[in-house]
């Protein structure tokens, strides 16, 4: 007897797709999965794996119709939800994003979904609701630092630099609580207030003489009392990218490579200058042996 896959049906492409997925060969997996999904629109597993594979390749436009199909079928799919969150942010349709997250169609983590909903409300023009959501999250351990950081970022994006600095100063009392990115945003908040002497002191405190080219440029701006050309976090999309980057970092430490890569790719898409997200994605791909991606 001939193998079933050689006779007819989708067993061959499906098995080939699974093999490619396990081998982290995303291009090959996508090719076979598109064939499976094209002929069997009820195969949720294949659709979710196709979304993961496409996002791993940095291809987003193809995944939105697939994600719509999954959600329209009433399936609770984190992968599909991530795709639709990405689309809403890209087109700045924050009211749709608020509705999606209010309907519990997010990541499935209370703090993460709360942060996304807060940012979505900022984008929709309802900052009061955003901060009310933040208030409900502030006692969540061990995420207090993350919530405070995003509260500071919202103030920063809104141009409330004094409020942002007050929060950064408070977070900074805890050893190691501010990441490099957080310190840079704090410096830019101080510079926006013309607090260049304080900015110089903060730069010295956190980095000392160990300055890379980016920090040397920032030091030059501080000494010349001028604002940098652009802010590291300057929009709602940048803020949401920061949420996805935090997830990617957490997942990378747990060796969940496909999901870490997905969230890093989203951060990279939403904030094109997000160097850390680009480097994290590259590191995950290197660990997978996918050097060409």
What are these regions (language model features)?
Residues 17, 51, 85-88, 118, ...:
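Conserved small-residue packing positions in alpha-helical repeats and bundles
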Residues 1-68, 72-79, 83, 91-94, ...:
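N-terminal leader/linker segments that initiate helical-solenoid repeat arrays
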């Amino acid at each position: 007897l001939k193998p079933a896959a050689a006779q007819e049906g989708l067993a061959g492409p499906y098995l080939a797709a699974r093999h490619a997925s396990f081998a982290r060969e995303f291009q090959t997996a996508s090719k076979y999965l598109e064939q499976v999904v094209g002929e069997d629109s009820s195969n949720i597993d294949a659709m979710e794996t196709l979304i993961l594979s496409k996002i791993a390749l940095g291809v987003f436009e193809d995944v939105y119709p697939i994600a719509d199909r999954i959600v329209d079928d009433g399936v609770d799919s984190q992968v599909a939800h991530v795709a639709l969150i990405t689309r809403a942010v890209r087109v700045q349709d924050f009211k749709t994003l608020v509705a999606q997250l209010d309907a519990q169609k997010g990541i499935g983590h209370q703090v993460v979904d709360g942060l996304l909903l807060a940012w979505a409300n900022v984008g929709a023009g309802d900052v009061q609701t955003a901060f009310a959501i933040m208030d409900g999250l502030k006692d969540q351990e061990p995420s207090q630092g993350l919530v405070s950081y995003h509260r500071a970022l919202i103030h920063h994006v809104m141009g409330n630099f004094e409020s942002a600095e007050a929060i950064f100063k408070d977070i900074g009392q805890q050893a190691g609580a501010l990441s490099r990115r957080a310190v840079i945003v704090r410096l830019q908040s101080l510079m926006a207030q013309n607090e260049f002497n304080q900015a110089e002191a903060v730069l010295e405190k956190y980095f000392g003489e160990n300055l890379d080219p980016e920090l040397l440029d920032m030091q030059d701006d501080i000494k010349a009392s001028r604002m940098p050309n652009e802010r590291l976090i300057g929009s709602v999309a940048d803020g949401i990218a920061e949420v996805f980057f935090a997830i990617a970092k957490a997942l990378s430490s747990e060796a969940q490579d496909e999901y870490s890569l997905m969230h890093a790719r989203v951060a990279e898409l939403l904030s094109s200058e997000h160097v850390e997200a680009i480097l994290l994605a590259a590191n995950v791909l290197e660990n997978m042996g996918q050097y060409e991606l």
